[in-house]
Structures are given as structure tokens and as C-alpha cells.
Amino acid sequence: MAVLLAGCAVTAPTPAASTSTPAAPTATATPSPTDTRVETPSADAALPPVQPVGDPVVIASGLDAPWSILRLPTGATLISERDTALVRELLPDGSLRDAGTVAEVEPNGEGGLLGLAFLPGDDGSAGWVYAYFSAASDNRIVRMPLTGSAGGLGFGAGEPVLTGIPLAGNHNGGRIGFGPDGMLYATAGDAGIPGNAQNLDSLGGKILRMTPTGEVPAGNPFDTLVFSYGHRNPQGIAWDSHGQLWASEFGQNTWDELNRIDAGGNYGWPEVEGIGGGGGGFIDPVQQWATDEASPSGLAIVDDTLFMASLRGARLWRILPSTGTVDPWFTDSFGRLRDVVSGPGGTLWFVSNNTDGRGSPAPGDDRLYQVEVAP
């Protein structure tokens, strides 16, 4: 368990919740400061919604462009750094040690070492750490055997899981995670070529689904790795208690999105940005934001309450699909926020991203924060 650093609480005002009823959307709607239209899915028994309680505290500081927080089943935590290609281990006193460097990472613009995921071993081994990263000519996913124990974690040589994901200075996607079905999911951006998103022969602009070793699993809608398409730059994925996959996505100039992901779904990019009324067979987002209020990256779900980290928006969004409630937390308190995950003991962890070249870092940035969440 991490020991919280004393004297690091930061006070932030409690927001007033905002709710709205979905209106009939139009493809040419003018952006409002925040569009809070949320569709309400059917659910058996809704879990009580949760929200942050009290002030966030700093768990660790001195991170360099952190990208992904990976909490292991043992309670240990690893954090990827985009530009250094380092995986850092969080120690109980809040300090950080280098667990290792991921080989072949070539940082460039928004590319570098991005998402992390973990697969427990089924043969008595410690399991596998998966990494999504930008190499010299493509984005790729590797897996590395986890070695050592808490306080001395490391990993062995990587073996390829997937190569050939389109690469660019931006729009690289990069989030990975194992779903409740045991399959590995990955978000792939359009690599700055909008046409990739509608091209089913391209891995770009997609959410991908694969076996732990990179093969096409049974049940994929096109008998390829493509699970959904029509995405611009999705950077967050998470599953609710019903096994439903959700994804956050960067828009271009008008709308950022939160999408409920269905197998084979076409989410519209580049034909549609934001809510387009369902024309052309495109699936509308369940939520959209003006880009200066979001630029969403990491996504976490706690008791079916969604939390979304926002970069340009510099806030943590809380979304309740069951009621249509959307509200911002900690606006401008910590700068750009890159990732958010469920923490230990009824907490939420999130990491700032002010050292990524687009923020205004303060001394000690970037930081990992913890805040309690409760109904």
C-alpha cells in the first residue's frame, strides 16, 4: 500500500451536478460550452453512483510525461513515461524507481511509450506486462515477462504481440487493456490520415481486439483484429459491471466524445464528428464536449460511475450514464490530466501530464494523485 506524502492536500471546490435530457441532435449543431446529452442504457440494478470526497493528495511526484498507470493484483503500481521509455515502480514511501526501459521506443511528438496492461501468469509465472509504444516505423504492442517482487520489479525481453499499427507524430491512440472476456483491446488512432478510420483494411482509427498473443479471436465482427471503426484518436477504454466497453476519443476542432462500443460499430470519423443523428449507419457518442473542455485520455469506471481524465480541459469528468448526469471536478487545479484508474480502498488515482510539451509544469511535476470516492 502506498504511503501518502504529508502536507500535499489540494483544496478544490465541489461541483454542482448537471443533468439534461437527450435532445434531437443535428450534425451542424454549434458547440455550446458543454453539451451534456447522455443516452440512458437499460440496466438490471444500477450501482449507487460515487463521487470524489475530500481533497486529492499527492502520492508521487517527479514523473516525466507519464502516460499509463498500471495497478498490479499484488498492489504494486507501474507507470509508463512517454519520452524516456521508462517504466517506473511506485514504492510505499512515495518514491519511484526504474523498473526498466522498454526497448525500441522512438519518442516523436505524441508518440513514445504509451499504454500498459497486465496479464496474470497461468503457469506459476508472475505474469506479463504489455506495452503499446511507437517504434521507428509503426506503433506496436509487446509483452514482457514480469520479474522480481514489489520494491524490485522488472521485466524480461519483450516479444511482439502486434506490429504495423499506423504511426505519426500524433493520433497514435495507445491505450490497452484486458476485457472481461480475457481478450486484449487496444485503441489505435488514425495517424493523421482520416481515411484510415473508415478503411477496414487499416489498423488505424480502430479499437482492436486480439488474443493475448495477438491472434484474431472468435467473435470479432470482420474476422480481423478490428472490433470497431470510425475513430479519430481514442485514448481511454474501460468496462462497466455489465461487461460493456466504453471509450473516450479526441475530436478535431468541435467535439470530443465518450462512446459506448459495440462490436462492428462505425463511430463516424471522418464523416461525422460528435453527434450526427445516427445517419449513414454511424453510432452517435453518448456524450460530447467542446474540445477546450476535454481532450480526453484515460478512462476509469468505479461502480458504474465513469471518470475521464482531460488534457486541454484540465479537469476530471464524472459521467453517470444511468441518469444523464455529467459534472467536472478539480478544474484547473492540477493542470493537464492524462490517466485515471481505480485505486485501493475506495479511492481514485489520476496523474497529471504537464511535462508533455503542452502544459505549464510546476516544480515537482508530474504528479500522481489519490482521492477518496464514495456514494
What is the meaning of each model-derived region?
Residues 5-7:
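C-terminal motif of bacterial Sec signal peptides marking the signal peptidase cleavage site
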Residues 9-15, 22-193, 244-251, 293-330, ...:
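Acidic, Gly/Ser/Thr-rich repeat motifs that build Ca2+-stabilized beta-propeller blades
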Residues 144-153, 208-217, 261-269, 273, ...:
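Short loop/turn segments immediately following beta-strands, especially the blade-tip
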